[in-house]
A protein has these predicted regions:
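Pyridoxal 5′-phosphate
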Residues: 1-372
């Protein structure tokens, strides 16, 4: 007998069957509709952390058995991450706190070699893929259409119009407001045709579909573990090492150098020069465990089940009088499970409170860090 997809996937995640109190004193099983903001952990991730904790030690800083064990996990994890996202063999993996830090690292590195160049972002970006570029680059924004989809014609118009002066196009893989999935191969083709490079903010996309960096023409990819069932403060940046070689690191400190005198600093090679300080080894262990779990799943089955849920929920929401749905066309095949809506004359925070206090349903409300 084929197992119900809901049962199959729910059993992997910790805390989804916990009862929470309502305003009237009763209790219900909580519903996590705020997973786009952060996810609960996989049970396998918690087990991995529990099993690894007694063996945890500092990395790259000793020859003790536990230190060697921890260092091996940390370094071998880079290979797993590269394989997970289909990176080029020459790409490097930089461990980060989250997607935001990863993008800031790229922005810092590029400013040393892209003076006078332009960065293109889009009108559908999270602030993490907008603000880091503003202080060091001239910027322009690719428009979106009435459905919230990226306007590829406008992208080409701007790439052509800047006559080879665009250094980088920074675009989200999937919108954290509408869930719309960008066509990365089409974007990549245009970006490279006009001599630029492509950075993908993969925070919302990586947990939902397989990524093939080399095949899809992605030069830099950033993502967070806390959006892929490993909420323990880690993330990753994958990309070409060249831009990180001739720059000051984004964060300076121990572990990022080979030699220091009073008047000289010899920075280590990337990725190490961008990983100053004692790293979050437990967070990396959690990220790697989450990747192992995702690799065991049939992502096509996950996608099909997700699309069924999206269709079901949108169909129900359309029955509510006056509701405003965003990024929800009749056909929603190019979309992850994010549904944005408003109700007339009801403030968003009040809607969120009613859902939580009276229904046990957790949602994200507000601007989603995606203004202006």
């Amino acid at each position: 007998m084929k197992k119900n997809p809901e049962q199959k996937f729910r059993r992997l995640v910790a805390g989804v069957d916990e009862c929470i109190p309502l305003l009237d004193g009763s209790e219900v099983v909580g519903i996590n509709f705020d997973n786009a903001a952060t996810t609960p952990p996989f049970k396998s991730v918690l087990k991995e952390l529990n099993d690894f904790a007694p063996w945890y030690s500092s990395i790259h800083r000793g020859t003790g058995y536990k230190s060697i064990l921890s260092s091996d996990l940390f370094e071998n994890g880079r290979k797993l991450i590269k394989k997970f996202v289909g990176a080029d063999c020459d790409d490097i993996v930089i461990y980060t706190k989250n997607t935001t830090e990863a993008i800031n690292i790229v922005a810092n590195a590029l400013r040393y070699q892209a003076e006078g160049k332009i960065v293109l972002s889009t009108d559908m970006e999270h602030l993490a893929n907008d603000l880091p570029w503003r202080s060091s680059f001239a910027m322009d924004y690719v428009r979106i259409n009435h459905e919230g989809k990226l306007d590829l014609n406008d992208l080409e118009y701007k790439l052509k119009g800047y006559q080879g002066n665009v250094r980088l196009v920074a675009v989200t893989g999937a919108s954290n407001v509408t869930g719309y999935i960008n066509s990365i191969p089409q974007i990549s083709y245009l970006v490279h045709r006009y001599g630029a490079e492509l950075l993908i903010d993969g925070a919302q996309l990586v947990p939902h579909r397989e990524i093939h960096m080399k095949e899809e023409g992605i030069d830099y990819l950033a993502f967070s573990a806390h959006k892929m069932y490993a909420p323990f403060g880690s993330g990753a940046l994958i990309g070409k090492p060249e831009i990180f070689t001739h720059c000051q690191p984004n964060t300076k400190g121990g572990g990022a150098v080979t030699l220091v005198t009073h008047d000289f600093v010899d920075w280590d090679k990337p990725p190490y020069k961008e990983e100053a300080g004692t790293p979050n080894v437990m967070g990396v262990a959690a990220l790697l465990a989450a990747i192992h779990c995702l690799q065991k799943l049939d992502m096509e089955e996950v996608h099909e089940y997700e699309q069924d849920l999206i269709t079901y929920i949108i169909k129900g929401l359309r029955k509510i009088k006056g509701i405003g749905l965003y990024g929800c066309p009749r056909e929603c095949k190019d979309k992850v499970s994010i549904i944005a809506f408003t109700l007339p004359e009801i403030e968003h925070r009040l809607i969120a409170k009613i859902l939580s206090y009276e229904g046990g349903i957790a949602v994200r409300s507000g601007l989603f860090c995606a203004h202006p």
